[in-house]
């Protein structure tokens, strides 16, 4: 699942820089911004059949590739 | 009695807070006293006015709506979009009526009978809750917590805009003495900072600069006069509102609540994007989370456009225009919203241009200073629009008997 998530991040952001450091802050590095974050939400919702409401997306919990993977896993486990 | 407006108010508030401070230091929340305090201060603020009925009526109305939607969405587990939109519309209806009322009853008379101090801000709280119930983030709305959240006294007049889940989490958490001591410390400091901002700096700017220059600019508009009034107003707006926010946050801190902040050195913003992450943050983030992001997500999911640029531009327009309308239905509030939308759209376009042309602009003290300077001035132009001074200038030209600005 992690690989699938990272592939989606790569498609949405157009870069695979984050793979070098899965804990780099994607927003600070300009890899993600508000728009791409929403694209990411839409893709992740579709791929894993989960619900990701924008107001829940606390940047502190979603700003690295590892954190995103963890959040998706949590959501999947909830269902 | 207006909140935070007279020394007498602060004395009473200070005395009233002492039991809560002592209780918290002893590890107790004293919820019954907090509720009593809220009722007492609401009474002090609203009694003797007709608006107290609007305040109570509004609370009853919103409780019915929110509890209904909780029953519908959680108990019945239904999620029809049309019910959601209907409930949202009902929730904002009192606010819309209050804002539209002056169009039908222009002039200095009393506003809509539905209006009361803080209606604009409380409405944000209920609308956000309805959206989060829809999203499944809020699964229960306990009545007592809901009412306390809605009527939470320190922030009732102008925010900061808090969020239900955050507030309830804090409400339920036990008192941790070290944390409270830290909060107490910060709270007291913030109240003093608020005093400095609102009653000293803001007051001086108004008394010795803004008040006079606004009148001069209205009667004898010139580039110099108008620019001066622009800076005076913008600085006054900041110190006055940031001061109020510090009071609200500081008092909440004393009661044990770590409320989110409203301002973070906004005049150091390097670009308009940065600015909206520093200025009236609780409002900005509310609009971002509950308007912009939802709208953009809907566009993408429903595939109304493939063009990301178009989607974000429309998103900015809708977001900022709504914010303009929320301030009031005057041409200058709406223009204020539109202008900020243009700034956001323009800034994105500038970023794309730099990327396309591969311009590598160095990041040093000088370029930072220039970006801050440009952003500062673009933002202050928006404050000038917002102040209504241009409106006064135009109206004064048309009719010299039109009332002068009275800041």
UniProtKB/Swiss-Prot annotation, chain A:
PTMs per UniProt: 4'-phosphopantetheine is transferred from CoA to a specific serine of apo-DCP.
Protein's cellular compartments: Cytoplasm
Residue ranges occupied by any Carrier domain in the UniProt entry: 1-76
Cellular compartments per GO CC: cytoplasm
Classification via InterPro entries: ACP-like_sf (IPR036736), DltC (IPR003230), PP-bd_ACP (IPR009081)
Main location, first listed in the record: cytoplasm
UniProt name for this protein: D-alanyl carrier protein
